């Protein structure tokens, strides 16, 4: 059996069951394990469901049970500067950001990794459902988690080779149900704790109310593509492409009784465009432009390749051709795609391997920009 006792692994512990089991498994495998709780958001003046104080108590309880030292580190400034400012800027620009992708890139695998190194870490570990595999040349490949429903490589797609070289994902080969079983068998304090949802580190707050604290909403006109007035919208930032609920128009104004969806935004005129039907023609596109293109291992500056891609989390893969030009790419779809949303991540896969991805700038239909922004 390998002696891991001289290998120090610093585990990012959130107070949830996944990171608790991550720490437990590493301890059982003989590693020198340290737990670290990251405080990334000041919730003292908020009425959120999730509180950092309760989570830290859970981290302390689990660390004591496992028998590992634990620390708390405050990344509120880093989170605000590197993630939250970006999040607000994207909404201001009419896009729908994915803060979890940026949070992993900038906080969990940058600020936290840097902090772990000061504790003498050889590796960091998190409770993400993903896998890392080292090839004969020492290159680390990031693979999907074995639990298809929980795979989180979409959110980890901006990680660099340097970050992956220093990362362990002990849950990657497990199903979520197995993780719960391990926690219950070990009697961990977090075994029955429900999974967190909501924005990375901000918790389950009322999103509309939360956003309005930071960005003043500007009401405006709601219209169909052909110019029919449909009433008033509450502020473009509250709507995302392809959204159905929250429009306040129900089945009215249409002869065919199909539901209404957000099909576009005009930021300069502050107009929200809506249309009837899940597959409304304005929602369909056959290519996209992306920026911040990044690969998890070394790739040429300019090249073209075929692969599969996801345009949002928990979406089946779609076949695409990718034309890479530096940190930008054109992604052409084999089949038309619905509701490609600027600000979201496009993530590339080769079978089980996550190759990387970028941020969606604009969708196109037969070379013409979709009426999104």
From Swiss-Prot:
Catalyzes the 2-thiolation of uridine at the wobble position (U34) of tRNA, leading to the formation of s(2)U34. Residues 98-100 are annotated as: Interaction with target base in tRNA. GO terms for molecular function: ATP binding; tRNA binding; tRNA-uridine 2-sulfurtransferase activity. Transmembrane segments: none annotated. It comes from the Bacteria. It catalyses: S-sulfanyl-L-cysteinyl-[protein] + uridine(34) in tRNA + AH2 + ATP = 2-thiouridine(34) in tRNA + L-cysteinyl-[protein] + A + AMP + diphosphate + H(+). The record marks 128, 344 as: Interaction with tRNA. This is tRNA-specific 2-thiouridylase MnmA. The lineage of its organism: Bacteria, Bacillati, Bacillota, Bacilli, Lactobacillales.
């Amino acid at each position: 059996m390998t002696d891991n006792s001289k290998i120090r692994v610093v585990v990012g512990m959130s107070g949830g069951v996944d990171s608790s089991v991550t720490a437990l498994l590493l301890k059982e495998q003989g590693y020198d394990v340290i737990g670290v709780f990251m405080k990334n958001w000041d919730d003292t003046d908020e009425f959120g469901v999730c509180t950092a104080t309760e989570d830290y108590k859970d981290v302390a309880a689990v660390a004591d049970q496992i028998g590992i030292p634990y620390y708390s580190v405050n990344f509120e400034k880093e989170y605000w500067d590197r993630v939250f400012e970006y999040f607000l800027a994207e909404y201001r620009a009419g896009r729908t950001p994915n803060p979890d992708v940026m949070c992993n890139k900038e906080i969990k695998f940058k600020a936290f990794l840097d902090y772990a190194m000061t504790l003498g870490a050889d590796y960091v570990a998190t409770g993400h459902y993903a896998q890392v595999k080292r090839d004969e040349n020492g290159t680390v490949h990031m693979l999907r988690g074995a639990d298809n429903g929980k795979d989180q490589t979409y959110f980890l797609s901006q990680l660099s080779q340097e970050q992956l070289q220093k990362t362990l994902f002990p849950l990657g080969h497990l199903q979520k149900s197995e993780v719960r079983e391990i926690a219950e068998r070990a009697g961990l304090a977090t075994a029955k704790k429900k999974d967190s949802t909501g924005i990375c580190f901000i918790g389950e707050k009322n999103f509309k109310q939360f956003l309005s604290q930071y960005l003043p909403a500007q009401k405006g006109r709601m219209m169909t593509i052909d110019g029919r007035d449909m009433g008033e919208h509450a502020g473009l930032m509250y709507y995302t492409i392809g959204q159905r609920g929250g429009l306040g128009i129900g089945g009215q104004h249409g002869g065919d009784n199909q539901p209404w969806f957000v099909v576009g935004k005009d930021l300069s005129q502050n107009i929200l465009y809506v249309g009837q039907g899940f597959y409304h023609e304005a929602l369909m596109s056959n290519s996209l432009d992306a920026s911040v293109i990044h690969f998890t291992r070394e790739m040429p500056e300019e090249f073209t390749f075929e692969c599969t891609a996801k345009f949002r989390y928990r979406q089946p893969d779609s076949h695409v051709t990718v034309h890479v030009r530096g940190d930008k790419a054109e992604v052409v779809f084999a089949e038309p795609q619905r509701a490609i949303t600027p600000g979201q991540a496009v993530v590339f896969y080769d079978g089980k391997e996550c190759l990387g991805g970028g941020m969606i700038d604009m969708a196109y239909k037969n070379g013409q920009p979709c009426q999104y922004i």
